[in-house]
From Swiss-Prot:
Gene giving rise to this polypeptide: cycH
Residue ranges of coiled coil: none
Signal peptide as annotated in the record: none
Matching PROSITE patterns: TPR, TPR_REGION
Membrane association type: Multi-pass membrane protein
Protein's name in the database: Cytochrome c-type biogenesis protein CycH
TPR repeat segments: 150-183, 221-254
Transmembrane segments: 4-24, 93-113
One example of a Gene Ontology biological process annotation: cytochrome complex assembly
SMART domains per the UniProt record, alphabetical: TPR
Family classification: Belongs to the CycH family.
Source species: Pseudomonas aeruginosa (strain ATCC 15692 / DSM 22644 / CIP 104116 / JCM 14847 / LMG 12228 / 1C / PRS 101 / PAO1)
Function: Required for the biogenesis of c-type cytochromes. Possible subunit of a heme lyase.
Keywords annotated in UniProt: Cell inner membrane, Cell membrane, Cytochrome c-type biogenesis, Membrane, Repeat, TPR repeat, Transmembrane, Transmembrane helix
Compartments (UniProt record): Cell inner membrane
């Protein structure tokens, strides 16, 4: 920041030099004007002297006129160029006023449209915060300086959540959702903030946000976790188990949250047993003949238009059945080519499993924004029997286009 102001000061000095040099030169013109005034006085004195001599009879009228002409020529010679010097006098105030206004106007314009606040923020974020409150204050200043930054609003919302400021977090996530095109991850965080700030009550708005998030990304982890919590709080333990088992199936094995979620599943089973209900059977790999093996790849043409960390969803959906995927696996472009297995263990809903439908369609979709909505790169397979045992090749080779309604 010091370097910036030093450079700005040097530039200002250069600008003032251009303005003040003419003003300093004007001082020399003052001496010239004084000399001109003296010459005029001498001229007038000479004319008066000639007139006196003519009145005394020592000069003729012709000699008087010759004397006046000679005095006028001398005055003209002495005052040559004085007109230009006098014009410089008139302009002397202009550079002086400009010299004062230029830095003031420049400073005002810079403070209004400049990026001094962003430079200061960048300097702040280069240093580790001393507390969570300091980090929050920095993020608040950041979104004020860049109100159209979806990432800034998202991280501010996450920070508010760590401070149990759910209402503030909900407003931040709402703004992030508007700026990000309503990405599923942001919608899930927004729904979660509304849920916890509203006394853990499921509302129509929260349900709509959760549905929208899962429609875009069936494996959106925040939404699955939230729906499991809401179901548990409402003593819908079977639903809670279903949501949490779906969540566990998409989390990496090394994710520390897995053990906590599995603990929640176990508590839900115990509550069902205490209430005299039969818990659902633990999720297990599907029996032989219901597992579909898919070899997923991406064409060179599409590979050049996506990023290595873009999400890839591989899923199966029923032919002539509901549009909800029956089983889904999540990869990244960097994982391709890859071989995955889809089975009842990957079911999105307990009542919708591969084994419940005779034919399915395999789909692999690239999601730049981490969701599975239309408009992404896609590869589709032909309808096949769920009893198919051979590996199926699936290549992502073109943009997603709306399909005609399936029979």
């Amino acid at each position: 920041m010091i370097d910036f102001w030093l450079a700005a000061g040097l530039l200002l000095l250069a600008a003032l030099a251009f303005l003040l040099i003419p003003l300093l030169r004007g001082r020399r013109a003052q001496a010239e004007e004084d000399r001109t005034a003296l010459n005029v006085a001498l001229y007038q004195e000479r004319i008066a002297e000639l007139a006196g001599q003519q009145a005394a009879g020592t000069l003729t009228a012709e000699q008087l006129e010759n004397g006046r002409a000679e005095a006028a020529r001398e005055l003209l010679a002495d005052t040559e160029g004085s007109g230009e010097e006098r014009s410089s006098r008139l302009g002397r105030a202009v550079p002086l006023v400009a010299a004062l206004l230029v830095p003031l106007v420049a400073l005002g314009l810079y403070l209004h449209w400049g990026a001094s606040d962003k430079v200061e923020l960048a300097r702040e974020f280069a240093q580790a915060p001393h507390s969570m409150e300091e980090m929050t204050a920095r993020l608040e200043r950041a979104v004020q300086a860049q109100p159209d930054s979806a990432q800034g609003w998202y991280f501010l919302g996450r920070t508010y959540m760590t401070q149990e400021r759910g209402a503030d977090a909900a407003r931040a996530f709402e703004r992030a959702a508007e700026l990000s095109g309503r990405q599923p991850e942001v919608l899930g965080q927004w729904a979660q903030a509304l849920y916890f700030s509203g006394g853990k009550k499921m509302t129509a708005q929260i349900k709509a946000l959760a549905d929208e998030a899962l429609k875009g990304d069936p494996a959106e982890v925040t939404t699955l976790g939230l729906l499991g919590i809401a179901a548990f709080e409402e003593q819908r333990y079977a639903d809670a188990i279903g949501f949490w088992e779906r969540l566990v199936s998409v989390l990496p094995n090394e994710d520390p949250a897995r053990s906590a979620i599995q603990g929640g599943i176990q508590r839900a089973r115990e509550r069902m047993t205490e209430a005299g209900q039969t818990p659902p059977a633990p999720a297990a790999p599907a029996a032989a003949g219901v597992t579909l093996t898919v070899k997923v790849d991406i064409s060179d043409a599409v590979k050049g238009q996506v990023k290595a960390d873009d999400s890839v969803f591989v899923f199966a959906r029923a032919v002539g059945g509901p549009p909800m995927p029956l089983a889904v696996k999540r990869l990244t472009v960097a994982d391709l080519p890859a071989e995955v297995s889809l089975s009842d263990a990957d079911a999105m809903m307990p009542q919708l499993k591969l084994s419940g439908f005779p034919q399915v369609e395999l789909v692999a979709r690239v999601s730049r924004a981490g969701n599975a909505i239309s408009g992404e790169w896609i590869g589709r397979g032909k309808p096949l029997s769920t009893a198919q045992s051979s590996a199926q090749a699936l290549t992502i080779d073109g943009p997603d286009q709306p399909q005609a309604a399936r029979p």
